[in-house]
Amino acid sequence: MTFITRWLFSTNHKDIGTLYLIFGAWAGMVGTALSLLIRAELGQPGTLLGDDQIYNVIVTAHAFVMIFFMVMPVMIGGFGNWLVPLMIGAPDMAFPRMNNMSFWLLPPSFLLLLASSTVEAGAGTGWTVYPPLAGNLAHAGASVDLAIFSLHLAGVSSILGAINFITTAINMKPPALSQYQTPLFVWSVLITAILLLLSLPVLAAGITMLLTDRNLNTTFFDPAGGGDPVLYQHLFWFFGHPEVYILILPGFGIISHVVTYYAGKKEPFGYMGMVWAMLSIGFLGFIVWAHHMFTVGMDVDTRAYFTSATMIIAIPTGIKVFSWLATLHGGTIKWDPPILWALGFIFLFTIGGLTGIVLANSSLDIALHDTYYVVAHFHYVLSMGAVFAILAGFTHWFPLFTGYTLHPTWAKAHFGVMFTGVNLTFFPQHFLGLAGMPRRYSDYPDAYTLWNTMSSIGSLISMTAVIMLMFIIWEAFSSKRKVLQPELIATNIEWIHGCPPPHHTFEEPAFVQVQE
């Protein structure tokens, strides 16, 4: 098989998963670089980079790159492609060629996003792309149009991937295997795919209307022609809120596997509770979107509904957190790097969840909306939730993907540096938000200097951690320490073919005997 047929025309779920992981790692470095530019600008009062426009272009690009080109490709495309077929005993994904197309739509999408920042003054709209700021007056030129096309491509990629994962998870498992006997990671990817399939078309509609408002003189979001900018907010957030659950649900699946494995358990605590908690989170995620819009002026009964509906999500989330703790309980914990990431995830994700409960209160949110309190909240659940889950999964399955082992001491040191860096970066932002520092500004009054400087120092520590990770991965490939024998393979069937597994697995259907 030539290099080109293997890597460009690939129909193999393992190779496509590897492509997604490499793409996500590269995009992650771009996104990290953008975040360091943001923290450098905010490291002290005064201007570093230029005006607020360039600053907001960087903020917008940072969000898009991290969401659409780092977290989603790695979690869904990387871990999802690699593990879902192995975990259900399928020979590959249901639609292997469509799988390849899903991946190859992403590099052009990324290219369009980068192009948007090189024409005119860039798209400095924030990742929400609200009109009228995103309209053709405030953002004349092609920048926002290129960003919209980028989103269209990433969206098509995700929708195709979602169809593929739904079909695979439901239809490609052995007939004797009920859906309630599939591993939790398979469930998490299935639910994530359903969320993508239902939410992305709404985003596509919203940004297409924005495109025609900008270029074809329609007035969907322009009051002068009978439109309403708040309609855009509803369309965007009907996608945007499920999106944040799309980013974290595969992480829930990864953490369930890692916690179970390193606690030495053969199954997670409360499997059915875990499944129904994820289903509940997926359902509730669609009916709370307007909590992002408490400041646009809604009726008191509407605010009351969105406040209480948002708080209800804490219940299934709590079920998951306590089930992870119950899984750990009574286990002989194996203190390998992945469990450190998983424990860090549980602790920090819970803190992020608590600040989320605070923000769910519409009255409090009116004071805190668009302050650094919100930034701190979602970075605790993303920068320490999603990213820690990715690193837990990566350090756990790296031997499966490559056949080599990471250096255990360095991997633990990397956890320590990263843990310090992200907490020092984002914890002070709660204080800034409570003190009223607004988001999306490149400068601030001197009173906010101390916590901003602390936050920026934290970002440099996180950068050190990223460089450490690059070295640790290089060291593993360089030293070529082979995997001897994974433990607990009876209850973790992704490992049964050895490390790494052969190019084709389960070519003939697996024999499944169901325990009565």
Curated annotation (Swiss-Prot):
Catalyzed reactions: 4 Fe(II)-[cytochrome c] + O2 + 8 H(+)(in) = 4 Fe(III)-[cytochrome c] + 2 H2O + 4 H(+)(out)
Mitochondrial intermembrane topological intervals: 42-51, 119-141, 214-228, 288-299, 359-371, 435-447
Cofactor: record remark: Binds 2 heme A groups non-covalently per subunit. Binds a copper B center.
Subcellular location as annotated: Mitochondrion inner membrane
Enzyme type, top EC level: translocase
Binding annotation for Cu cation: 241, 291-292
Pfam families: COX1
Domain of life, per lineage: Eukaryota
Residues given in the record as Mg(2+) binding sites: 369-370
Cofactor dependency: heme; Cu cation
Protein name as it appears in the record: Cytochrome c oxidase subunit 1
Organism: Struthio camelus
